[in-house]
């Protein structure tokens, strides 16, 4: 079998490394609309060969490792794939992608979301072992072909990932809280500091807490714009719930009600019981 990867940034490039190490594919080829990224990916050995988009469509298994809106646009150009082909997307929001799949390739399609990654992006961000022990969420498998489901499972298990099945609407609701909201908060924290009179002085004092909280603000704005747009309603609901918590904490501090504030923080401590 031959594998093709569309998008050779962090997720696609790291996947290329994982598939090559797994060794089940005769070759792993790639395409990136950014010619410099494609050249760099080849230099870094992320894929065996970089080709034109149409050549990737001839592969047995095709991975879409690009921003969510790019995935939707790309799927509309993929109706010429082999009847037996397996198309696997790695997008961070699922419902809109699934809603826009051309009917002729719905059985070919597997909606997957690997819960891994870093704040870095581009081919240079690719790392070996990114998918090892990572949780991969597979959505709406009942609408995918039996053969395609088995191939996808074999691949992800082969690169040492863990699998869970979920409905796409449930996925989008849940990841709004554990993935999308943290990025909103990280961008907000970074901008709050950058808009102060002397941000450099403030940041010179930064320790582990600030670095942990602001790390995600380094993430790709274009990728996250797509995710926020495609999961808009769930992201807004998560922001609303978080705003309510912040407003409550603010009110307790304003009113010198530190007992309530302590109870609130103690309740948050219980999160660690689940992690």
Model-derived features with residue positions:
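Short beta->alpha hinge that forms the Motif I/post-I loop of the SAM-binding pocket
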Residues: 33-34, 66, 90-92
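Residues at the starts of beta-strands that form the adenosine-phosphate
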Residues: 2, 27, 108, 135, ...
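Rossmann-like NAD(P)(H) cofactor-binding subdomain of soluble oxidoreductases
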Residues: 74-124
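Short, structured coil segments at secondary-structure junctions
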Residues: 44-46, 83, 104-105, 159
